[in-house]
Amino acid sequence: NGELLAWVSVGPLVDFYWPWKRAGALGEIAKSTAGIVCFTLAPSQRGKGQQREILEALKPYGREQGWTAIEAYPFDPSALEKHKEHVIWPGLTKGFVDAGFKRTEAHWLSNPEAERSIYRFEL
């Protein structure tokens, strides 16, 4: 019916402007590390496991691209209470955890409550 169901922006960290600090911290492996910098689902698709399905599909795609890892920078669900639906664009932690991503550290832009973290999946 032409409805947009999801949108994901993913690619090598070195191809994106805003994670330059993260790419610098990773050094040479940043070239083979992909970052999911945006991830959103249409309201009609939320709560149905779609985030996990998309993340699972990114794994073989990432291997085909030669990536060695995929990182994401989602918000903790507690951020929804504070910021309402304006924080959904990078995704929520539950979908990444369900897809096997592991929290590595607090996000460099996050506040002290760490409502946003870095999650990583090694390919």
Which residues make up each language-model segment?
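Conserved acetyl-CoA-binding loop-helix of GNAT-fold acetyltransferases
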Residues: 38-41, 47-63
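C-terminal "cap" of GNAT-fold acetyltransferases
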Residues: 88-99, 105-123
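Conserved beta-strand edge residues that scaffold enzyme active sites
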Residues: 2, 76-77, 110
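Conserved GNAT acetyl-CoA-binding A-motif
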Residues: 62-87
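Generic structural signal for helix capping and beta-alpha/helix-loop junctions
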Residues: 17, 79-80, 113
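Conserved acyl-donor/pantetheine-binding loop and adjacent beta-alpha core of acyl/acetyltransferases
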Residues: 3-38, 83-89
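Short coil/turn motifs at secondary-structure junctions
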Residues: 13-15, 44, 77
